Amino acid sequence: MVVEAMSSCQFWYFDDITKYGRIEVLNNYVPTTLVTISILILLHNFFIRFYKYDIKKETPTPSLSLKLSSLNLSESDEEMPLTMHAQHNYGSHPSPSELNTDSSALYDRHFSINNIDSGEVNDPTKYHLIKRNMFEKFRVVIEFVIVAFQLLLHCYLSIEKSNLNGDLQKFHFKPHVLLWTILFTLATLRVLNLNQNNKFVNKYSGNIWLVSFANYTVIFLAHILPFRSALIGHVNDYGSSQYYKSQFWLNLVLMALLLTSPIGNNLPVLYQPQQDRAPSPEPYVSLLTFFSFHWVQPFINKAYKNNSLSHSDLWSLKLEDYSINVMKSFLEFRNRPSMRSSRFGISLLRYFLNLFMFQWCFTTISAFSIFVPTILLKKLLDFIEHKDKGSMNLAWFYVFGMFISRFIVAICDHCNLFLGRRVCVRMKSIIISEIYSKALKRKITKQSKPADENNENDMIKHDEVSPQEVNDTTHVNADEESYSSNLGSIINLMSVDAFKISELCAYLHYFLETAIMLTVSLILLYKVIGTAAFVGILITIIIIPINSKLYAVVGTLQAGNLACTDKRVEKLNESFQAIRIIKYFSWEDKFKEGIMLVREKELALLLKRCMVWCVLAFSWFITPTLITGCTFAYSILIEKKQLTTPVAFTALSLFTLLRDPLDRISDMLSYLIQSKISLDRVQRFLETEETDKYDQLTVDKNGKRLAFENVTLRWDSDKDSFVLRNLDIEFMTGKLNVIVGATGSGKTSILMGLLGEMQLSEGKIIVPSLSPRHEYQSQAGVINDSIAYCSQAAWLLNDTVRNNILFNAPFDQARYDAVVEACSLKRDFQILKAGDSTEIGEKGITLSGGQKQRVSLARALYSSAGHLLLDDCLSAVDSHTALWIYDKCISGPLMEGRTCILVTHNIALTMKNADFVVMIEDGKVKEKGTPIELLAKGLLGEDENMKKSIISRSASSASLKGKSERSLGTTPAPVEIVQDSTPVNDDGKLIEEEGKAMGFVGKEIYKWYIKMYGGWYTIVALASVFTAILCLQITQAWWIRNWTVKRFSDVDESNYNLPASTFIVESRNRVLLTNEAGKKESENQNAGIAKFLVVYCLIGVMSSIIGSIKTFVNSLFGIRASKLIFDSLLDRVLHARVRFFDSTPIGRIMNRFSKDIESIDQEIPPNIQSVFYSAIEVFATLLLISYITPAFFPVAIIIVLGYSIVGFFYLTTSRELKRLDSISKSPIFQHFSETLVGVTTIRAFGDEQRFIKENLSMIDQNSMPFFYLWVVNRWLSFRIDLIGALVIFSSGVFILLNINNIDAGLAGISLTYAISFTEAALWLVRQYSELEMNMNSVERVLEYMNIEQEPLIADPANAVTPPPQWPDSGKVEVNNLSLKYAPHLPYVIKDVTFTIEPLEKVGIVGRTGAGKSTIITALFRFLEADTGSIKLDGVNIANIDLKRLRRSITIIPQDPTLFAGSIRSNLDPYDEYSDEEIFTALKRVNLVSTEEMEASTSEIQSNSSKNVNKFLNLESEIAEGGSNFSQGQRQLMCLARSLLRMPKVILLDEATASIDYNSDAKIQETIRQEFNNSTVLTIAHRLRSIVDYDKILVMDAGEVKEFDHPYSLLLEKKSIFYNMCEDSGELDVLIDLAKKSFISRLNSDSKK
């Protein structure tokens, strides 16, 4: 019986709450406080909403909130679409001319995400209501009835108070009546608003659900202790007892009703952007479901049932989580005056401050609740030890308290982590979006930086831009430590750095939790051990800076490691982008060597980091032992205190508790350092200079002019940078303007100047418009004043042909057909299996060079732009097609009234209809005017052939018109067509969907990794080390127990058995608090204690050393596995067939080499370590528990089964989500790469916002599996923690039920080891699941181990080794050759036979799809012969080594490729030639002249009016892809490279297409002279370049149609070759040249 005569203000006495506590505190103060707070909240909500609805216009806010009053409801509908108040026309825009043309306003109109049409987010049909079903309505009615009953009950009790007895007589019922009146009013409003159509409730009530729930919860909590008092008989009168019991159950029901109902008043509105994708149920889940993560259970069930998930099975994100809404909200926040000067990282932290504060609230509750179970555990053991002095009721209270506190910790921890993951998803979206947006805004060249900035910004690779048509542009910074912002490093920013930053922010709350835990632990230590605790604190303070220094070293190594990773990714990306060139020249081994050198540096830094990490690990392991030993030594030896057993074990337990926060802060500091490095990298990139396009271009008021007024332009601020000087050009509006000039004179740079991509030094550039493309949507189909651009090297999207032409413009069948006709694409659509629905692959890989150029031209022509800039679009097509395009496209009806500026070398073709000509020479305007004026001055051709060609064009124009119906007609004659490029499927699909394995990661994956890791012997050895560590920890614990038994036999075993288990597992929940000092020990016991401390410390040191060795060994073997896996992967990919690269996007390949390799490098080894240790720990713990308390073993089996079931469900789902997460990253990489390469074209079209929007969409596609992966992770963790709480509860119940048969020592060990086992099992499940998910990276890499390889010898049975000098003559024999791309596909080369004699020059011609390129690829064995053979000097190429074959012949490809490095490294990668030989080769291809080589450098630089020729310096840097040289210069460098090799067989594939005619003539002369000892095969569209060859091979439909001397073919007017020459408009000139060559050959033969 509780003594009631207590102090009037005492709340608790002995084992129960006092009467004062029940009556005054819980039943008077609590309701009064609730009434006050509820009234204030309701009034605040009412007035806020009243003013909000009166002042604010009722406009919808579709991006983040939806007005429920705008919904049309029908009682019969279960789910209805959203109808908004006012439908905004989001697709319409004001006329661009009416908008602000200020540069900053223009900038925002192009790039601001706030201006992006949110698309489906603004579509009201995408929103759906979840209506309350009858059960939910019934629950609201039940709530109303109970609240009404409560109101009536308390009114009655208030009236009858004088007649009541006991506690009720002292109640103040007025606060109760007022409180229940408020709650009754709220319940009434909820009933009135059941169908969501009560405007008053919706507008003015605020969140009445939250107010009601908070009140019900607090009232329920206030009645728990009185209910307990009634149960245990401490409430004297019957009426009061029944009141407490009834209030407990009634308020529990009320709380449960709202706890299980959807959160909030309003019916949930779900966003469903796709009809085949279910919306996220998160908005309408109940609070209980939310806390328990049960709302994701249907998703888990689906994954378990199907054993697989597809992307369409994923739920949508919440509306607020979609990246476009996140970005709009973030940018709005960042544009606040107080935030504009903040750095990016600070802005992110402040933006998410509200979510962080929610986390901190949960963290604070969790951090303090962590200590409750251990305190109650000690109390419980004290009761068991002294049963006669304690209360059984209080013991049961302790057991329930342990369960409740663990339950609270579980809820708080997982809400923390869930909020952190939401921050992570949103932050990753922001970072990637900002990086992408910055990439669109950046200048394409580096700019000068202030002296205090070390980072240089190199050029991105832009395949479609030839920025400098002369010898120099931007240097690539040679400093390896500088920040290189090229393609590879930018991809690394978004794939690695964005992840590291966002991942850290998901766990920032750990810093606060650790601080609280450390503070509480240290305070308790001081209370237990006194001033000696400061010794431990001092050691902790000393160790922290030492560890911080080590962390700084780790940070430095991490920065170096990331720099190496960047370099490796750059080299890999460059290699895969140029894989055809690498294979042509058999450079796979050379490039692999260069990549592996960087990889070895990367792994060396990783190993160094692991070594430092091992030192840190030793510090972590030894710290608790060091602190304990020093503290006890100080207490015994300095303070001369007698260290009692209770004090010793309490201190030991608290020191053990310190290990967890110390470990956590160590991990978090490591993550913080890595994230800070990543954030700095992102910050540096975001600070790079942006395009000045909108500042330096002036918009013409009439929207017509394109002009330069005394303009000087340069590419960058380097003194040697190429400069356009004194440009004063007024292009003719609505006419054809032609720019001509020699290769490298600056033609492309003029177009870049008009597009604002060059740096304006002086003058004024006038353009018709700078409005973004989306602002013209309302004018679709009408020619406007915008600009369209067709680059010299076609830039195409990895999409269908049609989508590339449309470029997101509205489809107009008539206009589309006209454009296809004008660009001569009809016949090409017949070639392609799916016509214009054919996927063209990455960089248009399925198309020939001419097809790519025509698709790019069609895109510009189809656009509504009134001004077209065409950069040498005729160079890549044959003469027939060039004439067609010129007549039907450039001069055709679709160009009527549009301004066209055409850069070209084909003067003879383009002068006929040109209205204005600009001739460029060395960056200056040499002459401008009409073609007749320039012709009169002799500037359009100095030789007679050029003049004759222009005259012959005029003379033959009539015949051309007559034959246009025959050869240029819109309907070509039916012909058999072959595929002359990469084949596609019948449905036109080239790019295969990325494969996704199903089910568990297979055993073969683990076996393969173990093989790479070191084999089974290594695994056994590692397991032995883990076992040794665990044995040492157990030995340390048992040493404490044995010493305690020996030295303090007068102290009960419960005081020494219990803490011993704290050293089995580093757990934060094993503290035993003791407030009583044990019996005094004599001073001579101190010697025994000192001996104990020495042995204890020695065991701890041994355990720490072995633990560090374990970490190092695991890291060492992990690095070994990484090295072997990367080496194998690189080798397989580099030697894969070309078809693999055609059908696999580079972004997908790079995903393997970036994110997957990173997982293998840095995530799998720690996972292996954790899984091994946890598994051994669980096994050892089971043995110990079974040994001490055998009755626990069946319970442990049930627990294992429970964990296994939960873990199996989790693993099935998380594995599939991890795979989907990996797959959905690849499109982001691919889209990123495409955008970076095509940024000039995108900006020229003003289409930035569309690409930003597409990037946001792809981020969302990746965020779905990533977010739900971590929600499922929370689902697992909550259930495991709940099982753990139930284990503690059941253990306590078991002890109390058997209290007479168990002592305190056994009870303590049983309970503590049960906790230990639960946490060890939890960690095992988590880490194994994590390992399984990370092994998905190994699985994806192993998938590439099976890609088809190029055979070294196609026919091993007949393998031969040719002599060293082979080939010595250069004879090529093709016998009955037939080729097909795959066994199920038709032949592309059909029974072809021809022979090329040694030293012959043979030109290969034919229409697109004739098979020209296929023949070339067959010579390099890209395709193996299906039938027939190709012999080179009598040796069948199928029988010789592939490397030997490719090194014996040389090709100069149509798309020349250079590699990052120097001119020397590109011309002579193996250092085989002298400087003199290299300069001679450069001179022969006209890249340098004799005069330049003889002139001194000072003389060249002194002439500031001329651009410096960078080819005079062989160490001049070449940017990635050679992007700092023009297309023509790159072709000439490739030719120079071939001149150095001087092979017996050389193949030229349109090698001079981008070179001016004069240079072409010189190059052809060089080819004839320099390759007079070589056999030359040339594919050419310029017939003049091959008409004097020895023979012409005419192909059509995969067959040889003609093969003879060109003059012989021209004598036959019905020949295909004659028709081609006639179509070119240069028939007379070609006949004359062929005749001269024929006569020369006859004379040469007669002399022989």
Curated annotation (Swiss-Prot):
Keywords: ATP-binding, Glycoprotein, Membrane, Nucleotide-binding, Repeat, Transmembrane, Transmembrane helix, Transport. Residues 361-674, 1032-1333 form the ABC transmembrane type-1 domain. ATP binds at residues 741-748, 1406-1413. The chain crosses the membrane at residues 28-48, 140-160, 175-195, 207-227, 250-270, 352-372, 392-412, 501-521, 523-543, 612-632, 643-662, 1012-1032, 1089-1109, 1168-1188, 1191-1211, 1282-1302, 1305-1325. The keyword Lipoprotein does not apply. GO terms for molecular function: ABC-type transporter activity; ATP binding; ATP hydrolysis activity. Induction: Azole exposure induces expression via regulation by the transcription factor PDR1 that stimulates gene expression via binding to elements called pleiotropic drug response elements (PDREs). Expression is highly up-regulated azole-resistant isolates. Disulfide bonds: none annotated. Glycans are attached at N72, N306, N471, N573, N710, N784, N798, N1042, N1255, N1376, N1503, N1524, N1573. GO terms for cellular component: fungal-type vacuole membrane. Gene3D superfamilies: ABC transporter type 1, transmembrane domain, P-loop containing nucleotide triphosphate hydrolases. It holds the Pfam family ABC_membrane. InterPro entries: AAA+_ATPase (IPR003593), ABC1_TM_dom (IPR011527), ABC1_TM_sf (IPR036640), ABC_transporter-like_ATP-bd (IPR003439), ABC_transporter-like_CS (IPR017871), ABC_transporter_C-like (IPR050173), P-loop_NTPase (IPR027417). It is found in: Membrane. GO terms for biological process: response to metal ion; xenobiotic detoxification by transmembrane export across the plasma membrane. Pleiotropic ABC efflux transporter that might be involved in the resistance to azoles such as fluconazole. Belongs to the ABC transporter superfamily. ABCC family. Conjugate transporter (TC 3.A.1.208) subfamily. This is Pleiotropic ABC efflux transporter of multiple drugs YBT1. It comes from Candida glabrata (strain ATCC 2001 / BCRC 20586 / JCM 3761 / NBRC 0622 / NRRL Y-65 / CBS 138) (Yeast). The gene is YBT1.
